[in-house]
């Protein structure tokens, strides 16, 4: 219900304008050094209020670890952590407390639960994704132990698409742009949306790779039927607010190709292409895992919109508040965290795949 993962399980709680949001990460092996600098940096990457291209709401996003860590290392017990909400402005939503905001979750949440938490969307707010980023930082600490790195960036804003992918540039870019040559045009598209009291959609690219040059990813992460790696990746990404489509490898373009064009041919040195995006038969094949995540435009726009109230009466909705003009930007960081969580979960699952692995653990002496 509120949990992601099987062997590494993240459960989250809290609402956008509540006192705090939090999570419990269960299944983290003991003995992993907690990198507090990494944790803080990941939270800052997702943080709003850093420039005009994100929401003006700037939370401190300090992660308070309450359990599961002893003397700087994971203890093997559930890691509990909290993030306090300090910049919420519920009054911005007073005028729409009985209205349904178009393309928001207000309508479905109200009909499912019978409760209208109008304060920034309550549980359905993207504020909850801060917990996923914190948990993703812990997952990255685990993956680092086996030489796996996840990274992300923006490849498309509206119709302006990157032609080159530079993940190092994305780390320095205000909008996490992968293509320096297209960055200004992408920024202009966002600024034009802001001027018109509108928003704009975008596409994030997330990849997992070996930490060292020419280092491959582990082969066999995932299972062939009911725990397919690509299915778990898609499930995690689609569970994030605003995501409308997920592609792995060539994705939808695959349906336009012939087998002779799509197949990843092999040599003694390995695969000659990576149209599969690093996944075959539901399992990692050692190549880079390539994921594209498509975000819809932010539904919170500052234009009059036609809607209904909780009694079904037609009315006009004019929003206030602080909102991202393009949720894909900060969403890319969350997707990177989600891929880290999925891969860490699959690494732990893989320990059960061969008896040799268990013998290594239990027959050391």
UniProtKB/Swiss-Prot annotation:
Cellular component aspect of the GO annotation: cytosol
Gene3D superfamilies listed in its UniProt record: Chorismate synthase AroC
E.C. number(s) listed in UniProt: 4.2.3.5
Binding site for NADP(+): 46
Disulfide pattern: none
Cofactor binding, note field: Reduced FMN (FMNH(2)).
Residues annotated for FMN binding in this entry: 123-125, 241-242, 281, 296-300, 322
Names of the cofactor(s): FMNH2
Keywords tagged on the record: Amino-acid biosynthesis, Aromatic amino acid biosynthesis, FAD, Flavoprotein, FMN, Lyase, NADP
Pathway(s): Metabolic intermediate biosynthesis; chorismate biosynthesis; chorismate from D-erythrose 4-phosphate and phosphoenolpyruvate: step 7/7
Molecular function terms from GO: chorismate synthase activity; FMN binding
PROSITE patterns the record matches: CHORISMATE_SYNTHASE_1 (PS00787), CHORISMATE_SYNTHASE_2 (PS00788), CHORISMATE_SYNTHASE_3 (PS00789)
InterPro entries: Chorismate_synth, Chorismate_synth_AroC_sf, Chorismate_synthase_CS
GO biological process: amino acid biosynthetic process; aromatic amino acid family biosynthetic process; chorismate biosynthetic process
Catalytic activity: 5-O-(1-carboxyvinyl)-3-phosphoshikimate = chorismate + phosphate
UniProt-listed SUPFAM superfamilies: Chorismate synthase, AroC
HAMAP family noted in UniProt: Chorismate_synth
Record's function text: This reaction introduces a second double bond into the aromatic ring system.
Family stated for the protein in its record: Belongs to the chorismate synthase family.
PANTHER family with a match to the protein in the record: CHORISMATE SYNTHASE (PTHR21085:SF0)
Quaternary state and interactors: Homotetramer.
Protein name: Chorismate synthase
Lineage: Bacteria, Pseudomonadati, Campylobacterota, Epsilonproteobacteria, Campylobacterales
Gene designation per UniProt: aroC
